[in-house]
Amino acid sequence: MKHFDTIVIGGGPAGMMATIASAFYGQQTLLIEKNKRLGKKLAGTGGGRCNVTNNGTLDDLLAGIPGNGRFLYSVFSQFDNHDIIAFFEDNGVKLKVEDHGRVFPKTDKSRTIIQALENKIQELGASILTNTEVVSVKKVDEQFQVKSSDQTFTSDKLIVTTGGKSYPSTGSTGFGHDIARHFKLQVTDLEAAESPLLTDFPHKALQGISLDDVTLSYGKHKITHDLLFTHFGLSGPAALRLSSFVKGGEIAHLDFLPNQSQENLKNYFEENREKSVKNTLKALVPERVAEFLAEDKADSKVKQLHPKDLENIISQLKDMEIPITGKMSLAKSFVTKGGVDLKEINPKTLESKKVPHLHFAGEVLDINAHTGGFNITSALCTGWVAGIQSPWD
């Protein structure tokens, strides 16, 4: 059995950064990944461009992590989004900032980010073992025994970075939760987060339409971001973010023009009373949305509208009701809500309170963040903090 100071299970962003951090601090480190290549799920993020972080403030970060984000105060005091940016720039990756603070590599290729992480792991002398699935983990005489189908390794410290259960085709099968349960740690219920929404709505007429900076809300939760109408309902950042707060059976409200008041819109229609309803609406929303809202009044002039019809159009622009029937399954969601119970974890070190030198990082924890760079930020930062902890204390 070969012995390492630290073994990391799971080669996503948290695992790669944990490996880098532990190797940087002098730990002989092994990273084990079940897929043929590291970063399989990371490769598909940001439409394959890899939205590696967000350049916002600490408050922005916490707002972008609705699922227990405040647990990360101590983590972010040690390593935050600005450290992520500095890390990649120091390692030769040129970055750019797009709308909503989203940070991407200038190459627009996720491979650039993955390659930088892999290169750093190799530069620091850590070992990588891919195409290797861990089948069991146990602790014997203060050492962890990690078994694959044909090998056994031991370590003084173990970091579990196996992700949640979303997109299992990328390797996220929930194995890390099984490890936690083996060591008698609590795991909270798992459900879909950052999931497209299923709706009871005549959405086929709007299928494929993308809207910029609209407001989608349910109760006290208001999300202003981009939205996409699909054949099944709603997707895009606004829908994905709202999915953390709904289960099905709710009524969501869509404001196409959050920067316009109803009074302003009344004045706008009055100023354009000689134009057709469709053309008047086209100046505000995409043409197919204009046709959808105008219904059979599209070719009528605004001045010909009955006051109640005009009132209804304005009401639809500002407060369209969309019944939510459910969410995509956990397997088709971007993020897992739930995970290793944070009551079990030291927030400063991400170490188990019950099992010394057992650490968890990334989405395996009960932390869920929005798309837009927040989920990867959480993974990279928790990975770093778990990695820097000494296996010899």
Task: Specify the residue positions occupied by each region the protein language model found.
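A conserved short coil-to-beta-strand element within the FAD-binding core of flavoproteins
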Residues: 130-143
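An anion/pyrophosphate-binding glycine-rich loop and adjacent beta-alpha core
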Residues: 36-38, 43-44, 52, 58-59, ...
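Glycine-rich active-site loop/strand segments that organize a redox cofactor
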Residues: 49-97
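Short hydrophobic core segments
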Residues: 7-9, 32, 134, 153-169, ...
